Amino acid sequence: MIVIDTSAVLAVVLKEAEGSAFLTAMLAGNDCLLGAANLLETRMVLHARDPANIPDMDLLLKRLRVRIEPVTESQSDLAFAAFRKFGKGMRHPAGLNFGDCFAYALAKDLGCPLLFKGNDFIHTDITPAI
C-alpha cells in the first residue's frame, strides 16, 4: 500500500520525465491511496494548466483503482504538525505546502510510503515509495 502525492499524479498525467517510473510504482503498489485534499489540489493544478487533462487524471485513478481517502481529524492534526515542523515559512528545507502536509499526514497516519516528485519530502522523516 502506498500514498500518492499530487506531484506523482501530475507527473504521470502530464507525461513528465519521471511519469513512467511513477506509473510503474503505482501499478506495483497494489493498493494506492490519494487523500481527498490532494485530489482537489491535483484537479486545481490541472485546471489551471489545461482543464482538458482532468478526464485523463480521473481515468488514470479509476484504472489504477486508487482509493480516495477522506481527511480525518487526526490527519488534520498530523498535517498541522508537519506544517509546524516542515512547512513553508518555517525555515525548513522541506518547505511543505498545504497539499504536501496532507499527503504527509495520510502516509504517516497509515504507516505507508509516499510516492512523490521533487526535493521537498526528502527533507522530512517520510518513507519514500521509490
Language-model features: where?
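General small-molecule cofactor/ligand-binding pocket signal
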Residues: 33, 67-69, 129
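Short, well-structured N-terminal submotif of metal-dependent ribonuclease cores
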Residues: 1-34, 46-59
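A generic structural signal for short hydrophobic patches within well-formed alpha-helices
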Residues: 9-10, 39, 121
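Active-site neighborhoods of divalent-metal-dependent phosphate/nucleic-acid chemistry enzymes
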Residues: 68-113
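Acidic, PIN/NYN-like endoribonuclease modules and their adjacent C-terminal/linker elements
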Residues: 104-130
